[in-house]
Amino acid sequence: MAKQELMNLFLSKEFASGYKLAELVTGPFAQLLVDYSGVVQSTQRPLVILDNACGTGIISEALNRSLDSQTKGHWELTCGDISDSLVQYVNQRIQDEGWPRAKAQLVDAQDTKLPSSHFTHIFAAFECLRILQPGGTVAISNWQLPEWLVIAKSAVEAMPGDLPFPTVKEFLASLNEGWDSEEPTRVKLEQEGFDMVQVATVSQKLSLPKSTLVELIKPMLPVILGRFWTDEQRAKHEKHIPTALQQYLDDKYGASDDVPVEPRVIIATARKPC
């Protein structure tokens, strides 16, 4: 149920505009993923890069910022996502920010239908081995501690009604189990046929306004509640969660509008054997 709710969220027209806010949190990790991938130091030419499940294009933005003009003058950058609204958003971003030799297109991350042995670097997870060139690099990131979930759990538990809410581990397991720890991530990549696997846990200290944090959490609520609440609980209590979130943040942080958070992700890079 949670996976279907997540898919419905990705496909909704409102998702792209709301998801842009998430770059406040995902942006620093996108740059770290690019740094860890080694793409800047790569001697492979031309670079043929896939930003798979690209969202609003935050990884592609980091790539464009990190690589020099000569490299980008000959590269090929494909931004793929299953959401038509996000593809439209990224195509507009490509024009607005002047990304050379870049395009956005509809791509199902789990069945890309893209050509085999084509890309030098892929940023994402599914089906990467087939479409990578021999010697190509995959770089992925997955949440280990999405701190917004901890905040939402505390706020919901303060509401009347003894309402259930998942732990971080329970929620992540309901989506893709095993990608939130270093060793299982390493094992999964090696089992897929990759070598030179490197895995690290990284965190970023951020400060977000209360209202921004509430707006970041709201779009994810249907994904959580669709898995862990009954229809009756949702009908009665879901509409009260934003108010509960604001109340929790006001109680915890007082007059200060800044909320310190330190989300944590697993970053992994691996190579397709030559």
Swiss-Prot record:
Please give the organism: Aspergillus terreus (strain NIH 2624 / FGSC A1156)
Which of UniProt's keywords are assigned here? Answer: Methyltransferase, S-adenosyl-L-methionine, Transferase
Q: What GO terms describe the biological role, i.e. biological process, of this protein?
A: methylation
Keyword field contains Transferase:
yes
Family (UniProt)? Belongs to the class I-like SAM-binding methyltransferase superfamily.
Q: What function is annotated for this protein?
A: Acetylaranotin bis-thiomethyltransferase involved in the biosynthesis of acetylaranotin derivatives, members of the epipolythiodioxopiperazine (ETP) class of toxins characterized by a disulfide-bridged cyclic dipeptide. The first step of acetylaranotin biosynthesis is performed by the NRPS ataP which produces diketopiperazine cyclo-L-Phe-L-Phe via the condensation of 2 phenylalanines (L-Phe). The ataC domain of ataTC then catalyzes the formation of bishydroxylation of cyclo-L-Phe-L-Phe.
Among the Pfam families in the record, one is: Methyltransf_25
Report further notes: AtaS is located outside of the acetylaranotin gene cluster.
What is the name attached to this protein's record? Acetylaranotin bis-thiomethyltransferase
Q: Does the keyword Amino-acid biosynthesis apply?
A: no
Q: Which residues form a coiled coil?
A: none
Q: In which pathway does it act?
A: Mycotoxin biosynthesis
| Enzyme Commission designation | 2.1.1.-
Q: What induces the gene encoding this protein? A: Expression is co-regulated with the acetylaranotin gene cluster.
Phenotype of the disrupted gene, per the record: Diminishes greatly the production of the two bis-thiomethylated analogs of acetylaranotin, bisdethiobis(methylthio)-acetylaranotin and bisdethiobis(methylthio)-acetylapoaranotin.
A GO molecular function term, named singly, is: methyltransferase activity
